[in-house]
A protein has these predicted regions:
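Entry beta-strands of beta-propeller and related beta-repeat scaffolds
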Residues: 29-35, 120-123, 177-181, 224-228
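Residue-level signature of beta-propeller blades and closely related beta-rich strand-turn architectures
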Residues: 39, 61, 128, 186, ...
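Short coil/turn segments at the loop-to-beta-strand junctions that recur within blades
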Residues: 148-152, 207-213
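Short, structured patches in soluble enzyme cores that scaffold and shape functional sites
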Residues: 184-186, 194-196, 208, 219-222, ...
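N-terminal regions that are enriched for targeting/export leaders
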Residues: 1-104, 109
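Short, conserved, GDST-rich strand-edge loop motifs in beta-rich repeat architectures
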Residues: 38-44, 230-248
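Well-ordered mid-protein domain cores that form the structural environment of catalytic cofactors
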Residues: 79-202
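Beta-propeller blade signature
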Residues: 52-58, 137-138, 187-201, 238-262
Length: 262
């Protein structure tokens, strides 16, 4: 099916107080629906993947977060990360390319792909950057996960302030160990990364494990991590509702890694 035209709109995001106009809202429904997307005014360049991260939150209970007693709060905010602040100050030196938004400062960390809750904390993620923590109430930026020295930079140009970190857009929270598992690939070599939420990011190289392209998702069982190459292929006709014609690589690697061996 074709993508909705609203995805290509560059209208400025706004807060709204929404009303139910048909049917009845379930009384027992509560909580928050959190979405991630690129900001529409940064969708320039070869494709929209590198637009700066936005957070959208719909409260599922009426009368919260400033909404009236019969309305539901739709709130949004741009992630005010260091790269977003630098780009706002000097937009003239940032250039969207096929491998990211580059500048003399380094590469932007868009953090525009997926929300990741961890207890009462909230992180926003992306394939080509460290996970970013935001305040789940104010949606304000709190910090990137780990110091840049704890990650392996994919340095194809000088990156004095903004490192390019090849990670995954979908890390996982381990409920048994209360840690975050992710990856850090470096020139094709696979490293597993673990973070306890407070200290330094730990990493282990996986001997012989090669990632031809990138790792979009890491998943888990109680004892194992599962990592696969995403083998992403761009097919422009899909955007217009056409069928995919390129199959996934039949030889794309999948790695099963025991957690207790790290």
């Amino acid at each position: 099916m074709p993508l909705p035209r609203s995805l290509f709109s560059k209208d400025a995001p706004q807060d709204h107080d929404l009303r139910v106009v048909s049917g009845q809202w379930p009384d027992a429904l509560s909580g928050e629906l959190v979405l991630s997307a690129p900001h529409p005014d940064t969708l320039s360049g070869p494709h929209p993947f590198f637009g700066e991260g936005m957070t959208y939150r719909l409260s599922l209970a009426a009368g919260t977060h400033g909404a009236g007693p019969e309305t539901f709060a739709w709130r949004q905010g741009r992630i005010d990360s260091p790269s977003a602040r630098l780009r706002a100050k000097r937009p003239d030196v940032f250039e969207a390319t096929m491998i990211g938004v580059q500048s003399p400062f380094g590469h932007t960390n868009a953090a525009n792909t997926a929300p990741l809750p961890w207890g009462d904390r909230l992180f926003m993620t992306w394939d080509v950057g460290r996970p970013v923590e935001i305040d789940p109430v104010t949606l304000g930026y709190l910090g990137d996960v780990g110091h840049r020295s704890q990650w392996k930079d994919f340095e194809i140009a000088p990156q004095p302030l903004l490192p390019l970190v090849m990670s995954t857009a979908h890390p996982v929270i381990d409920p048994d160990r209360n840690v975050l598992w992710t990856v850090n690939t470096h020139w094709g070599s696979l490293h597993i990364a673990r973070w306890d939420g407070e200290g330094a990011v730990e990493q282990w190289p996986i001997t012989g494990a090669i990632i031809p392209q990138s790792v979009h998702t890491i998943t888990q069982t109680r004892d194992w991590l599962i990592v696969a190459d995403c083998a992403f292929k761009v097919e422009p006709q899909v955007l217009a509702g056409g069928e995919r014609t390129e199959p996934a690589n039949h030889d794309g690697p999948v790695y099963l890694i025991r957690k207790d061996t790290l």
